[in-house]
């Protein structure tokens, strides 16, 4: 694996990420959510993609793609491992979202190219990274209250907002993916909350991928 070449690709791609608001439709009619995971000891990569109406946040479509994993796990290069499955799920959607939430990092990455940014560039869609763990940068400790907020900083640059979305839950790291500003990324996530730790787009993507009760009930209603 030529990590020097991959690192150079990341730096080049990161220079093309748009950190300003460039939504084609604002407000969006549809917001998507995406989640990626691995099965069979990492040999299979799956990606779940959901489509929600906005502002109702009603689930209207979902797709799950499973493909052979194309590269091993290497810290800092996860987007190269994840985007092929995301692309396979994306291509199956009959209606593409106007804005996509990705479970993972956006520019809050050592080379400013997490999976939300990488995939946003690939398909040229506005994306937001909604990550559960810090990858780089520093932030001031948050209070335990829901709504506590702190900027994630690295070398004098704000990479994300660290936001405690729910009491007694770890915070989320909300960042520009592509064509969405840092402040707007936070605002969109906040608009898509319904009392859970995760915003509805990525919560539904996780529910679809994991076969959670909420998704099972939704399937029963559709029959």
UniProtKB/Swiss-Prot annotation:
<dbReference type="GO" id="GO:0016891">
    <property type="term" value="F:RNA endonuclease activity, producing 5'-phosphomonoesters"/>
</dbReference>
<dbReference type="GO" id="GO:0006281">
    <property type="term" value="P:DNA repair"/>
</dbReference>
<dbReference type="GO" id="GO:0000287">
    <property type="term" value="F:magnesium ion binding"/>
</dbReference>
<dbReference type="GO" id="GO:0043737">
    <property type="term" value="F:deoxyribonuclease V activity"/>
</dbReference>
<keyword id="KW-0255">Endonuclease</keyword>
<keyword id="KW-0378">Hydrolase</keyword>
<comment type="similarity">
    <text>Belongs to the endonuclease V family.</text>
</comment>
<keyword id="KW-0963">Cytoplasm</keyword>
<dbReference type="Pfam" id="PF04493">
    <property type="entry name" value="Endonuclease_5"/>
</dbReference>
<feature type="binding site">
    <location>
        <position position="103"/>
    </location>
    <ligand>
        <name>Mg(2+)</name>
    </ligand>
</feature>
<dbReference type="GO" id="GO:0003727">
    <property type="term" value="F:single-stranded RNA binding"/>
</dbReference>
<feature type="site" description="Interaction with target DNA">
    <location>
        <position position="73"/>
    </location>
</feature>
<keyword id="KW-0479">Metal-binding</keyword>
<keyword id="KW-0460">Magnesium</keyword>
<keyword id="KW-0227">DNA damage</keyword>
<dbReference type="GO" id="GO:0005737">
    <property type="term" value="C:cytoplasm"/>
</dbReference>
<feature type="binding site">
    <location>
        <position position="35"/>
    </location>
    <ligand>
        <name>Mg(2+)</name>
    </ligand>
</feature>
<keyword id="KW-0234">DNA repair</keyword>
<dbReference type="InterPro" id="IPR007581">
    <property type="entry name" value="Endonuclease-V"/>
</dbReference>
<keyword id="KW-0540">Nuclease</keyword>
<protein>
    <recommendedName>
        <fullName>Endonuclease V</fullName>
        <ecNumber>3.1.21.7</ecNumber>
    </recommendedName>
</protein>
<comment type="function">
    <text>DNA repair enzyme involved in the repair of deaminated bases. Selectively cleaves double-stranded DNA at the second phosphodiester bond 3' to a deoxyinosine leaving behind the intact lesion on the nicked DNA.</text>
</comment>
